[in-house]
C-alpha cells in the first residue's frame, strides 16, 4: 500500500498556494492604490482589497509596503488590469481578470490554456453580457436571525437578500458602488460577514457532464493557477464540476 504525501510535502504545497494568493492580492492592492490613492478611508476599492488581504492573514507590514510601492514611495513593478473572455467546451462562458506587467506574456498564457482544453478566446464583450457585476456579503445564520439581517441590509441599501437554509447561509447582494457602505453599516450593528467580495455572477448556469465537464474543470484550474490571473468567472453549474 503506497504512502500519501509527507507532512513536509503537504506543508510545501500549502506554502506555495499561500504564496500565489499573496502575490495576486499584492498586485490588487497596487492597482487600487494607484487608481484611488493610498488612503483606504478615501478609497473604497483599496479598502475592499485590504479586507481581503487581512482575511488571508497577510501582515499589515506587507500591505503597507504594497501601498507605498504603488503610490511611488517605494520602487516596485507597475501592473495594469486586463480582461479576456472566451468559451470553454460545451459553450461555457468564461471571463478572466488579470493584472500584468507584460500583456503579450499574459494573453499568450491565457490563449494557450483555452486552446489546450478545447476552448477558444473571444473578443471583448463576447461573453460579459451574460454576467452581472455585484457585491456579495455572506453571513452565517448563527450570528443573527434572517429577519434582522434582512432588515439591516435593506436599510443599508442592499439590492437583495438570499437565504440558503441547507447551507446555513444568508447572502446580501449589493451594487459594486454600495458594497463598502452596506458592509460597514451592517458591521456597525454587529453583523460581520464571514466572506465578502465584488464578483461577476452569471444570469443563468450551463450544465455539463462527462468529458465536457472534465475539460471545463481542467481549463478553469489552469487559468486560476496562472500567476497573472486574478479571478476566473464562468457560467458553468458548479455542482456538475463537483465544486460545491
UniProtKB/Swiss-Prot annotation:
It comes from the Bacteria. SUPFAM superfamilies: YebC-like. It holds the Pfam family TACO1_YebC_N. GO terms for molecular function: DNA binding. One of its GO terms (cellular component) is cytosol. InterPro entries: Integrase-like_N (IPR017856), TACO1_YebC-like_2nd/3rd_dom (IPR048300), TACO1_YebC_N (IPR049083), Transcrip_reg_TACO1-like (IPR002876), Transcrip_reg_TACO1-like_dom3 (IPR026564), YebC-like (IPR029072). Its main location: cytoplasm. Keywords: Cytoplasm, DNA-binding, Transcription, Transcription regulation. Signal peptide: none annotated. It is found in: Cytoplasm. Belongs to the TACO1 family. This is Probable transcriptional regulatory protein PD_0885. It comes from Xylella fastidiosa (strain Temecula1 / ATCC 700964).
